[in-house]
């Protein structure tokens, strides 16, 4: 991320004027939509680690679009998602009911459709099943009624593991790679169950937001 402390706002449509949004629509811009939650990530990571990660992914993809001369915008991040994990027991973990998430996401997609955008791609960095099922329900129901279509990225190697058949029209298949190979990680035996706020997420946050670790 750039050093600008307001980038979580200015890198998205929140830093654009309405005329810039209109021009992006005319350019057939793709919408990148970061989603996540605000939840406890141990004493060493910020509550917003998931949304910082998904927003960083969107920012990096936007740079690729810019370099290729293609238009895209980043929607304001949605971070009041759901969690059923034990992080609910910690101060600072916000969680929403599935129906609340579905309704909120559908209304956001309806707005993007009303602006005139044609395609939206989600970027999710939170693995809780409540979150994923709510997002997918919102995508499926929105795709049935909106002109704009939304897509959920999934690594090819994880498609069946994540419960997909592989032929879903909203599924955006992306090439798999060893995530942990993206960072220099030294693991201890107790890190083998590296799911939440452990070696990988810590390395990731050191890479994108070092001042927060």
Predicted segments with their positions:
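Extended, histidine- and acidic-residue-enriched regions that form the cofactor-binding/catalytic faces
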Residues: 1-121, 125-213
């Amino acid at each position: 991320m750039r050093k600008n402390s307001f980038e979580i706002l200015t890198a998205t449509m929140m830093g654009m004027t309405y005329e810039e949004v209109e021009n992006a629509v005319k350019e057939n811009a793709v919408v990148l939509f970061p989603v996540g939650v605000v939840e406890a990530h141990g004493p060493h990571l910020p509550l917003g680690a998931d949304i910082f990660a998904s927003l960083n992914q969107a920012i990096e993809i936007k740079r690729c679009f810019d370099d290729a001369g293609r238009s895209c915008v980043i929607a304001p991040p949605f971070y009041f998602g759901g969690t059923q994990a034990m992080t609910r027991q910690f101060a600072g973990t916000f969680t929403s009911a599935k129906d609340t998430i579905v309704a909120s996401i559908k209304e956001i997609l309806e707005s993007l459709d009303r602006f005139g955008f044609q395609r939206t791609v989600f970027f999710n960095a939170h693995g809780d099943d409540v979150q994923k099922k709510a997002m997918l329900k919102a995508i499926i129901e929105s795709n049935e009624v909106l002109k704009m279509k939304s897509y959920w990225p999934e690594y090819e190697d994880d498609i069946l593991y994540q419960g997909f058949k592989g032929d879903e029209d909203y599924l955006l298949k992306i090439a798999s790679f060893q995530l942990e190979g993206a960072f220099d990680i030294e693991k201890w035996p107790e890190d083998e169950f590296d799911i939440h706020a452990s070696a990988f997420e810590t390395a990731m946050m050191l890479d994108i937001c070092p001042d927060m670790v």
